[in-house]
Each structure stands twice: as C-alpha cells, then as structure tokens.
UniProtKB/Swiss-Prot annotation:
It is found in: Cytoplasm. ATP binds at G78, P79, E80, S81, S82, G83, K84, T85. The gene is recA. GO terms for molecular function: ATP binding; ATP hydrolysis activity; ATP-dependent DNA damage sensor activity; damaged DNA binding; single-stranded DNA binding. GO terms for biological process: DNA recombination; DNA repair; SOS response. GO terms for cellular component: cytosol. This is Protein RecA. It comes from Prochlorococcus marinus (strain MIT 9515). Keywords: ATP-binding, Cytoplasm, DNA damage, DNA recombination, DNA repair, DNA-binding, Nucleotide-binding, SOS response. NCBIfam families: tigrfam_recA. Gene3D superfamilies: P-loop containing nucleotide triphosphate hydrolases. Belongs to the RecA family. InterPro entries: AAA+_ATPase, DNA_recomb/repair_RecA, DNA_recomb/repair_RecA_CS, P-loop_NTPase, RecA-like_C, RecA-like_N, RecA_ATP-bd, RecA_C_sf. Residues 1-20 are annotated as: Disordered. Can catalyze the hydrolysis of ATP in the presence of single-stranded DNA, the ATP-dependent uptake of single-stranded DNA by duplex DNA, and the ATP-dependent hybridization of homologous single-stranded DNAs. It interacts with LexA causing its activation and leading to its autocatalytic cleavage.
C-alpha cells in the first residue's frame, strides 16, 4: 500500500469516527429532550415483527398474513348485511380469549348483546360506549388508546359519527365536509398513540354511491379520504351467496378482499361461511384449507380423510369434523404446519363456490344436504 493510499484510508476512518461521535451525541440529545424511544435504529427496535390478532376465520388470517396487525388502524367496509359487525365481534372474542381487553364504540346504537355472546364475546367484560356525537365517540377512542390498557377498539360505524354541529342544527341544514374534517383531525391525533400503545382500532364503514360516475366504480366510503390513508389494512367484505338447506336459509358465504395492506402482500381474497346466530364457521374455513392442501380429498360430493370417506356434501363433512374433535384438531395442526412451510393455496384462500361447473355442483349439494 502506497503512502497516498494509506493517508486516504486513515482520513476516511477518522471522518467515520467523527460522524459516529456526532451521531451518538445528537441521538442522546434527542432522547433527553423528547424521551427514550423517540428515535432509534430500526435494527434496535424491540418489535421488528408486527404482532397480529386472529380474525376468527383461518382463511382470512392467511390472507392478512396472520390477522389484524397490532398497533394499527384497520377499516372494514361493505354493503349492508355483509358481515362487518360479525367480523369485528369475532376479533373481540379472540382478544378476550387471550386475556385482552376490548371496547366497542356503538355509534349506530345497534349492538345485540345476545348475538355477541353467541359468537363467544364475554359481554360482561366488554367495554361499550354509545356516544351522542362524533366528537364524543372519537374522544373516547383517544382516551382508551392513551390508557394503554385496551387491546382492541371497534368503532361501528364511521357513517354514524355525526358531528355536533349537525346534531344541534335543524333537519335539512347543510354542514358540508364536517364529517370528513372530524375524521381527518381524529386520525392525526390518535395514529401516533395507537402505534405506541399497541392497540388495534377497527373502523367499520358503509358504502355510498358517487353521483354522475359513468365509468369506473361509483362506490365510495363515508368520512372523506383520511381513513383510507391512515389505515394499514382495508377490507372489502361482500355477500356472494346465500346458504340454504332446501328452502331454508341458514347463512351466507362472505368474500373479503384485502384492498390495502401495509404489513403483508395486499389484494388477497378470503372466503368463509357466516351462519345465522352462530357467526363465522371456523370448521368450514378449516375444511376449505384442508381441501386446498390435499389433507382432505374431495371426489364429487364425497370428502375423504386418510382414504376413508367422512361425509357426503360439505355440510355433512363439517358436522363429522365437529363430532370428531381429535381428528379435527389433528387436521388443523397439519394445515397450519403446511401453510407455515409455504404451501400455496388459490389466492391464499378458496375460490368462489360457483367459479366453475364442478364447484357449481357442489354448491347445489350444500343447499340440499341436511
């Protein structure tokens, strides 16, 4: 090494040491001024991996990359009677099963405690608020988040967060953009606290139609654009099929599209059954994924496990799995193991039941098999 090369190397090392010294000095000063954790190296962060809350549907957990992310904002939107509230009640039940605390801000004043209890929600320990105004609702949400004691807050719904000016005014008064301004201010205020507390906040939202849209999708959500930007996950839930036994309707088939996801790949699709009075069919989700991963084989209308037929038609197979809990638990373990190993399934969920002629026959079986 020549003298000139050695001089350049020594100069570079000296400059690097000075930069490190200056950086450590400013980092220490920032922490003294603003508190520990106000700035950090990303590699030193204590929570590099985002923890999740189960949705209650195995197929949707898979589509989301594990479930609802903790410490993030989630928006669930869709048409009426598509399963939005049911989806969040299952999330509340999952949080409570793990010893967490959940709150439900019922701006629509439509929560059914009996139905919530049937889904597994501990209604005696569920925090419920029925606010009079949108400002009151969002202030309650902010205080719950700041407490750091609550793991999940559900707001049902954004459309029902009525600004105080609108309530105090007369019917027919125009308060243009008041709800959008309210949501924009609220999101700016609570987002930072959500990340620090690790609390997940799920906003339910309704659909509206834009006037004068000839081309493209005329649907939009209420409350302006702020929630769309601040949400880490946005779920579009739709009812795609009514489940029947003969002429009796006993549930719906729901399809959820992950419209936005900042913590896992977006645009995945999940499907699951929602049974009236019972909620999401967890066994149905398990059967769908077991079939996708070839653990349970379907030939025509018959389902078989380890070479033995276990049920004719999807409904009978689900009943058989519910009656044989040891085998069900074993199948669930194998499914989760295969998915962890990276086994691919269609769109990381199931195809629509009537997506091809063969599945259309099975869809008919579901309606008719008792």
């Amino acid at each position: 090494m020549s003298f000139e090369e050695r001089r350049k190397k020594d100069s570079k090392e000296s400059s690097s040491k000075e930069k490190d010294k200056a950086l450590n000095l400013v980092l220490g000063q920032i922490e003294r001024n603003f508190g520990r954790g106000s700035i950090m190296r990303l590699g030193d962060a204590s929570r590099m991996k985002v923890e999740t809350i189960s949705t209650g549907a195995l197929t949707l957990d898979l589509a989301l990359g594990g479930g609802y992310p903790k410490g993030r904002v989630v928006e669930v939107y869709g048409p009426e009677s598509s399963g939005k509230t049911t989806l969040t009640l299952h999330a509340i039940a999952e949080v409570q099963k793990n010893g967490g605390i959940a709150a439900f801000v019922d701006a629509e004043h439509a929560l059914d405690p009996v139905y919530a209890a049937s889904l597994g929600v501990d209604v005696e320990n569920l925090l419920v608020s029925q606010p009079d105004t949108g400002e009151m609702a969002l202030e309650i949400v902010d205080q719950l988040i700041r407490s750091t004691a609550v793991d999940l807050v559900v707001v049902d719904s954004v459309a029902a967060l009525t600004p105080r000016a609108e309530i105090e005014g007369e019917m027919g008064d125009h308060v243009i953009g008041s709800q959008a301004r309210l949501m924009s201010q609220a999101m700016r205020k609570i987002t930072g606290n959500i990340g620090k507390s690790g609390c997940t906040v799920i906003f339910l939202n309704q659909l509206r139609l834009k006037i004068g849209v000839t081309y493209g999708n005329p649907e939009t959500t209420t409350g302006g654009n702020a929630l769309k930007f601040y949400a880490s996950v946005r779920l579009d839930i739709r009812r795609i099929q009514t489940l029947k036994r003969g002429t009796e309707e006993y549930g719906i088939r729901a399809k959820v599209k992950v419209a936005k996801n900042k913590v896992a790949p977006p645009f995945r699709i999940a499907e699951f059954d929602i049974l009236f009075g019972k909620g999401i069919s967890t066994t149905g989700c398990l059967l769908d994924l077991a079939e996708e991963t070839n653990i349970i084989i379907r030939r025509g209308a018959w389902y078989s496990y380890e070479g033995e037929n276990i049920g004719q038609g999807r409904d009978n197979t689900i009943i058989w799995l519910d009656q044989n809990l040891e085998i069900k638990k074993k199948v669930e373990g194998i499914v989760k193991s295969k998915l962890t190993e990276g086994t691919e399934v269609s769109s990381n969920s199931m195809k629509a039941l009537n997506s091809n002629p063969e599945n259309a026959v099975i869809a008919n079986d579901i309606k008719t098999v008792a």
